[in-house]
């Protein structure tokens, strides 16, 4: 697989980075979105176990230290409308996948490929270039 110089990581891929063995599958310069940072920020607030809360807070702090998130701006908002329409047209509810739809919109608005371990979540979205990353828990084919 050829590497893109820059690419947007979805939230699950960011969280799995320490477990992803093949760095060649990732962009040379990975980026995250403000939506991913927002999604991560929920984690420590809803964790009931103190150890889990601390681990999730560490993930947020690490993401903040490692990345300058791309914003959900007006261009992304316009792209979001198209993403939501595509999801609805394929029988999926954009509301149920709002974070994913917003991340996809940011990728489209910035003309970036989206790197994900959950490629099926982004299938059928026009204008979105998805780079599927093998999930570390998937059994080999």
Task: Enumerate the language-model features and the residues they cover.
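Short, well-structured N-terminal submotif of metal-dependent ribonuclease cores
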Residues: 1-61, 137-140
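Acidic, PIN/NYN-like endoribonuclease modules and their adjacent C-terminal/linker elements
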Residues: 1-2, 104, 110-141
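Active-site neighborhoods of divalent-metal-dependent phosphate/nucleic-acid chemistry enzymes
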Residues: 2, 42, 67-113
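Acidic active-site catalytic centers that drive phospho-/nucleotidyl reactions
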Residues: 10, 39, 100, 118-121
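Alpha-helix capping/helix-boundary segments
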Residues: 13-14, 76, 120-121
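Residues that scaffold the ATP/ADP-binding catalytic core of kinase and kinase-like folds
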Residues: 16-18, 43, 80-83, 125, ...
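Structural motif
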Residues: 28, 65-68, 126
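Helix N-cap/beta->alpha junction signal
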Residues: 33-34, 73, 100, 118
